[in-house]
């Protein structure tokens, strides 16, 4: 804005700095001294000094003084008590009138600038009111529409999150119950497997006994066969002996027929044969009895072993059926567990997806809230900047008011008359020519501070002749 640039330049020209508030990190103090001296040779010298000091926009003060001094700076000049050089007085009066004219022009310019500043302040106040109205409107809109929408959506999201949390807890409880059932069934399966192993070990021992009984039976059968062969051999041997004895008996009969006087051998042979037959029958009966007893014992042991084997087979079949039923039940429970785990994973994935969507929505809403906060902060900063500019303008207006009051008080003072001046006559021959040039000395002092410490200080002197 052109008005702001003009005000900033005028503020810089009057106070030695910018028209806005100073930065918090670096403070600058400007000291500007303007001295105007009118040299009138060595007799009369009116001097006008102007000093304007500014350390900060909040502490500006202005000192403006104008005086007429009479000096005598030339040694050895003869002074008279009763004569006045009116040419010098006319020159002084002319210079004084010119100074007053210039001051009137400056006051007129200051009045114009003051009016411009007042207009600018009014304009900035209007802009400030407009911005405040917009800020209040934005606050009302955000509170009425966006706030209610965000709160309603947040409540809905929280309700859904709570529902999903409850569903997840319920599924976790069901999963824990199924896990306990599976663990119990696994323990039961382990017990059944141990019992099956014990039954198989018992069956293996019974099979070993059966094998041993079969081997014993085979051995006994071989013994029976060998005994039968031995009996057959003994029978055959006995028959041969009987035949031999009969042959001998026949021969003895012949001999008896021939010789009647010999002893009777038939009775002896009959006795011997009866004895052998009785011994053979006895041995055969004993062998048969022993074989029968052994065969009965072995048959009884085989029957017992067969009963135990049959019972073991029945138990094994029963255990096998139980294992198969438990295996089927475990497989069914595994399928149920897998389906539940799959459903739980799907629910967790859906929950994670919905949570991510809700999180994105929350993040987007938070970003919008942050953007609105930043926009409000920007409006507040603009308002603060405008307030700082207004304060600076108020300070400048107060300064101008003090200047105007000082000028009014100075103008209201009566002008000194030449009759009241204590003038001394000087030797006009020794007076130099009147110096009509005005000397203006400008002192610019810049002080930079940071965190309360002076980091740089510069001074500049400018001498201008008018």
UniProtKB/Swiss-Prot annotation:
Residues 103-411 form the IF rod domain. The modification Phosphothreonine is found at residues 20, 426, 436, 446, 458. The modification Phosphoserine is found at residues 5, 7-10, 21, 25-26, 34, 39, 42, 47, 49, 51, 55-56, 66, 72-73, 83, 87, 144, 214, 226, 299, 325, 409, 412, 419-420, 430, 438, 459. GO terms for cellular component: cell leading edge; cell projection; cytoplasm; cytoskeleton; cytosol; intermediate filament; neuron projection; nuclear matrix. Residues 132-153 are annotated as: Linker 1. The modification N6-succinyllysine is found at residues 120, 129, 188, 294, 445. SUPFAM superfamilies: Intermediate filament protein, coiled coil region (SSF64593). There is a cross-link at residues 104, 120, 129, 139, 223, 262, 294, 313, 373, 439, 445 (Glycyl lysine isopeptide (Lys-Gly) (interchain with G-Cter in SUMO2)). Residues 246-268 are annotated as: Linker 12. The record marks 351 as: Stutter. Disruption phenotype: Morphological change from tubular conformation to circular conformation of beaded filament structures in retinal lens epithelium, potentially due to loss of contacts with surrounding intermediate filaments. BFSP2 and VIM double knockout mice show a complete loss of cytoplasmic cytoskeleton in retinal lens fiber cells. Phosphorylation by PKN1 inhibits the formation of filaments. Filament disassembly during mitosis is promoted by phosphorylation at Ser-55 as well as by nestin. One of the most prominent phosphoproteins in various cells of mesenchymal origin. Phosphorylation is enhanced during cell division, at which time vimentin filaments are significantly reorganized. Phosphorylated at Ser-56 by CDK5 during neutrophil secretion in the cytoplasm. Phosphorylated by STK33. Phosphorylated on tyrosine residues by SRMS. S-nitrosylation is induced by interferon-gamma and oxidatively-modified low-densitity lipoprotein (LDL(ox)) possibly implicating the iNOS-S100A8/9 transnitrosylase complex. GO terms for biological process: astrocyte development; Bergmann glial cell differentiation; cellular response to lipopolysaccharide; cellular response to muramyl dipeptide; cellular response to type II interferon; intermediate filament organization; intermediate filament-based process; lens fiber cell development. Detected in eye lens fiber cells (at protein level). Expressed in retinal lens epithelial cells (at protein level). Expressed in Langerhans cells in the epidermis (at protein level). Glycans are attached at residues 7, 33-34. Residues 1-33 are annotated as: Disordered. A motif ([IL]-x-C-x-x-[DE] motif) lies at residues 326-329. It comes from the Eukaryota. GO terms for molecular function: double-stranded RNA binding; identical protein binding; keratin filament binding; protein domain specific binding; RNA binding; scaffold protein binding; structural constituent of cytoskeleton; structural constituent of eye lens. The central alpha-helical coiled-coil IF rod domain mediates elementary homodimerization. Vimentins are class-III intermediate filaments found in various non-epithelial cells, especially mesenchymal cells. Vimentin is attached to the nucleus, endoplasmic reticulum, and mitochondria, either laterally or terminally. Plays a role in cell directional movement, orientation, cell sheet organization and Golgi complex polarization at the cell migration front. Protects SCRIB from proteasomal degradation and facilitates its localization to intermediate filaments in a cell contact-mediated manner. Homomer assembled from elementary dimers. Identified in complexes that contain VIM, EZR, AHNAK, BFSP1, BFSP2, ANK2, PLEC, PRX and spectrin. Interacts with BCAS3. Interacts with LGSN. Interacts with SYNM. Interacts (via rod region) with PLEC (via CH 1 domain). Interacts with PLEC isoform 1C. Interacts with STK33. Interacts with LARP6. Interacts with RAB8B. Interacts with TOR1A; the interaction associates TOR1A with the cytoskeleton. Interacts with TOR1AIP1. Interacts with DIAPH1. Interacts with EPPK1; interaction is dependent of higher-order structure of intermediate filament. This is Vimentin. It comes from Mus musculus.
